[in-house]
Amino acid sequence: MFDQLDIVEERYEQLNELLSDPDVVSDSNKLREYSKEQSDLQKTVDVYRQYKQNKEDIDEIVEMLSETSDKEEVDMLKADMNELKDTLPGLEEELKMLLIPKDPNDDKNVVVEIRAAAGGDEAAIFAGDLYRMYTRFSEGLGYKTGVIEMNDSDHGGFKEISFTINGQGAYSKLKYENGAHRVQRVPETESGGRIHTSTATVAVLPEAEDVEVDIKDADLKIETYRSSGAGGQHVNTTDSAVRITHLPTGIIATSSEKSQIQNREKALKVLKARVYDMKLQEEQEKYDSERKSAVGTGDRSERIRTYNYPQNRVTDHRIGLTIQKLDQIVEGKLDEIIDALTMSEQTEKLKELNNVDL
């Protein structure tokens, strides 16, 4: 582990020099790249230096103890040494966690797609509940959300809805939401009081940068059409809605707000995210064939969570977590679940690192 930490510290010092280089300062792309890399290493270097400083202080105290026989001074030095020794295990654990490879997409904005699945009208209502839950959660973090495309249900909620969440670390917070969500509750229209089960699927796609997805204009088919609201009513008087098809993959993205220019930009953003996501899914499948992760972020058909309204209970099936706070969770209080999922994934990765004698 310490060999790797030395390499990290050495790279940090190299970046300090590079960021002072006039050639780098004049190149905005390199300056941004190196600044981000240095920022990513900062915490690890700070903790490692604190660890080394504490070790050095302990060695100094040991040397001082060998040079004195004054009881009061010996007692004071030993107390200081024990206090420093007590910090080492915690710092070592923190360093192990900091060495866990970071998901390169964690800091990105996301596109979230929610689709009603089994359960008819109730599934659409549940899709609406999930949308509200995620927007409230995002607002609590200071993130901005924006609807790209929605297909309303006649009885409330959405048959499907896609929207953006923009903010530092959005993907790191939302990536565990990929999969099938199940709800168990008595519908308002159910006179017999029977509990119905419905599902909705959630896809969380990291926004793709141009350098990550090369999409040529010649590979795009762009169409405009008239958007319609619930019940088929026309909500636009012009053909402002946009549909973009990526011909090599057949991936389609649409946006149907009022501005055709904004729709084109939004649809293209979603298209890039979907093409990038397809690439990530292929890489994930390759990884999963070698190791099966308990906390998946890929399989969209995997049932990941159940929301049981009568018992005010939410269960995340991937880690066996059950929380009796459904009323708070659907209002956007997702932190307890997300923190548990993050810790579970980090623990798995730490085990893998330990297996290769890090």
UniProtKB/Swiss-Prot annotation:
Q: Which domain of life is it from?
A: Bacteria
Query: Under the cellular component aspect of Gene Ontology, which terms does the record hold?
Result: cytoplasm
What's in the keyword line of the UniProt record? Cytoplasm, Methylation, Protein biosynthesis
What's an example of a GO molecular-function annotation for this chain? translation release factor activity, codon specific
> Where in or outside the cell is it found?
Cytoplasm
The record ties this protein, via SUPFAM superfamilies, to: Release factor
Q: Which SMART domains match?
A: PCRF
Main localization, broad class:
cytoplasm
* N5-methylglutamine modified-residue sites: Q233
Outline what the protein does.
Answer: Peptide chain release factor 1 directs the termination of translation in response to the peptide chain termination codons UAG and UAA.
Which family is this protein grouped under?
Answer: Belongs to the prokaryotic/mitochondrial release factor family.
Q: What is this protein called?
A: Peptide chain release factor 1
Q: Which organism is it from?
A: Staphylococcus carnosus (strain TM300)
**Source lineage:** Bacteria, Bacillati, Bacillota, Bacilli, Bacillales
